[in-house]
């Protein structure tokens, strides 16, 4: 997980390594770093099926001297159930699945962002209000729901990007003008006055 500012996260270790905090509930990891003290938002990572194990600390998942290219948990065949209290939180879910030749199986993973009003942050002391997270996970719980959401997103961007269209005979120029230039204008519009692009 990024702790809301990727540049700061990669350099301000004396602070960041003392703030990481998560909750785990079934196959859902809630990243709530600084939620108690100064934030009204948290991240949520989930799978739409039961998990066999999980990790929420980078050292437990990757190994103390390991990295994401060859994580210790993957080599071991399972995660350790680590709960982050400081250091570097991660969201790792392990689902053991055996498929017969030609068989397929769908598993949906989701990563979301939730904001709660100040007066609705907690449901009990230290327990974050997960009502909005549960509603979001219910909206994307099946293949059909995810396919419908992707189709709606595709339609939105196609409509947005189809207002102006160039056919120059030069494929790369067409792509730059028809997609990336317009997309960059939209990103600039949405992110203007933002202190961070992370």
Q: Locations of the language-model features?
A:
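Polysaccharide-binding surfaces and accessory modules of carbohydrate-active proteins
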Residues: 1-76, 91-93, 118-162
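Gly/lys/ser-thr-rich phosphate-binding loops in alpha/beta enzymes
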Residues: 86-88, 95, 106-107, 122
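Beta-strand-rich interaction surfaces with strong enrichment in secreted/lumenal proteins
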Residues: 81-84, 94-99
């Amino acid at each position: 997980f990024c702790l809301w500012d990727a540049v700061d996260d990669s350099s301000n270790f004396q602070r960041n390594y003392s703030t990481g905090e998560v909750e785990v509930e079934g196959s859902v990891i809630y990243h709530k770093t600084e939620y108690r003290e100064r934030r009204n938002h948290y991240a949520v990572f989930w799978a739409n099926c039961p998990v066999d194990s999980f990790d929420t600390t980078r050292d437990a998942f990757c190994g103390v001297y390991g990295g994401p290219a060859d994580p210790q948990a993957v080599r071991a065949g399972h995660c350790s159930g680590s709960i982050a209290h400081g250091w570097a939180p991660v969201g790792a879910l392990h689902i053991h699945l055996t498929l017969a030749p030609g068989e397929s199986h769908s598993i949906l993973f989701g990563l979301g962002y939730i904001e709660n009003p100040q007066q609705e942050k907690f449901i009990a002391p230290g327990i974050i209000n997960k009502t909005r997270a549960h509603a979001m996970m219910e909206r994307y719980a099946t293949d059909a729901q995810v396919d419908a959401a992707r189709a709606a997103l595709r339609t939105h961007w196609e409509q947005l990007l189809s207002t102006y269209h160039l056919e120059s005979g030069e494929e790369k120029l067409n792509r730059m003008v028809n997609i990336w230039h317009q997309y960059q204008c939209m990103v600039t519009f949405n992110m203007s006055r933002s202190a961070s692009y992370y």
